[in-house]
UniProtKB/Swiss-Prot annotation:
Name this protein carries in UniProt: Gamma-crystallin S
PANTHER family: BETA/GAMMA CRYSTALLIN, GAMMA-CRYSTALLIN S
GO terms under biological process: lens development in camera-type eye; morphogenesis of an epithelium
Source species: Mus musculus (Mouse)
Keywords, sorted A to Z: Acetylation, Eye lens protein, Repeat
Keyword Acetylation on entry: yes
InterPro entries in UniProt: Beta/Gamma-Crystallin (IPR050252), Beta/gamma_crystallin (IPR001064), G_crystallin-like (IPR011024)
One MF term in the entry's GO annotations: structural constituent of eye lens
Cited function: Crystallins are the dominant structural components of the vertebrate eye lens.
Domain of life, per lineage: Eukaryota
Amino acid sequence: MSKTGGKISFYEDRNFQGRRYDCDCDCADFRSYLSRCNSIRVEGGTWAVYERPNFSGHMYILPQGEYPEYQRWMGLNDRLGSCRAVHLSSGGQAKIQVFEKGDFNGQMYETTEDCPSIMEQFHLREIHSCKVVEGTWIFYELPNYRGRQYLLDKKEYRKPVDWGAASPAIQSFRRIVE
């Protein structure tokens, strides 16, 4: 199918109408192919799509499926500029350690499960650093997997800017599973 094992198709109009751009690998700027994006079909894999070129701006994680209008992927508007395949770890294992302070200081909580509310589950108001031990995770700025999203691969994140955030305002997180 592709270099990534997946394929994503972007359509200018709702319900998979209008000009189409197919992608099977990371693309830093597809604005020259489409002036707007109102529907998406993910035919394989999980993809991160970004509001602006060079993998910047609001990010949306899209598993395989059909998105007939931008509201279905929680898009703010019909503007997208780049995409990349999300590389999932083999075996489906997932483990993350979250810390109440930067540089892995303060109280640490480890989990292998999704967390809809860090306040309810860990009695934390914010996450200042974390270690992704296994798997790929998404941080959300609001409880119940809402708000701005941040994609975290297996590595250490000493401060919020390391995962692309301006502040530690993370309120929920979940694993990406196949």
